[in-house]
Amino acid sequence: LEDFIFIILIYNNFIKKYIPVLPNNFKPFKSNKQNLIRVGPKRDGGYIIDKRIIKKSKTIITCGLNDDWEFEKNYLQINPECNVIAYDHTVNKKFWKMRFKKDFLALIMLKKLTFNKILDVFKYIDYKFFFKDKNIHFSKKIVQKKNKSHEVSIKEILNKKQNIILKIDIEGDEYKILGAVNNECHKINLLIVEFHNISKNIGKIKKFLSNSKFKIIHLHANNYGGIDKFNNPNVIEVTLINSKKFFVNKKKSTKKYPILGLDYKNLKRREDIRLKFND
């Protein structure tokens, strides 16, 4: 019996040490299994959505683009009537020149040998083909309050818009605009946010959730970010649905995260991050 108790204690210590424990209000609400689908690649850049929003959502607004629009591209294959409006002040001519130079050098030095990596060298061509006609990229910085011509606020972005999918990945600046997002919640069907530096900003996320009509329906730890000294993932990908527009079960999910067959590693060569919640 003593040996058994000792093993249990060792196991519990292992769990506490290696599996991040997030606050209970981060735990997703229960969703019907058939409603959750993955859009985008089975790697970094893919996200989970509720398929109930597809026919009712006509525009994806992407805040933070970098060089990845696979989610948007895949979504348009599912719903061709949708359009994409993206904002990212860092994606400009200088960005593409530096990226092409880096990728081309990697190619001639035989560091890019897979088909997909070779295609990446010509990413700019894909960018020009995708962002034309109904799909637009604005090289503007997303801010809480606009002061300069190259800046844009959430209120301005969502002006005269309805039934939006809003996707935010702006490397830590998301916390500055959460209040504005809540103020415009009646225009948004689905919200996808990458939260960065979780331990530092956990209070801000809790406040946002407590004051919001958006309810978490899915959560995944981005293994690119790893785990911090407080045993929290540094980056989490969160999908929230507007509970004023779509039914949300009041019960919390009992699923284990990541969800097999739905979630995939952002970085393939690194273990995915399992999550627990304070019940």
For each feature predicted by the language model, list its residue ranges.
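Acidic/glycine-enriched edge-of-secondary-structure segments
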Residues: 30-32, 138, 162-168
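Short, well-ordered alpha-helical scaffold segments within catalytic/effector domains
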Residues: 45-47, 69, 151, 175-178
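SAM cofactor-binding core of SAM-dependent methyltransferases
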Residues: 39-145
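Class I SAM-dependent methyltransferase Rossmann-like catalytic core
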Residues: 10-54
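Conserved acidic-Pro-Pro-aromatic motif
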Residues: 59-61, 71-86, 97-98, 155-279
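A short acidic, often aromatic-flanked loop/helix-cap motif at beta-alpha or helix-coil junctions
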Residues: 143-149, 223-227
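Core dinuclear metal-dependent hydrolase active-site scaffold
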Residues: 146-158
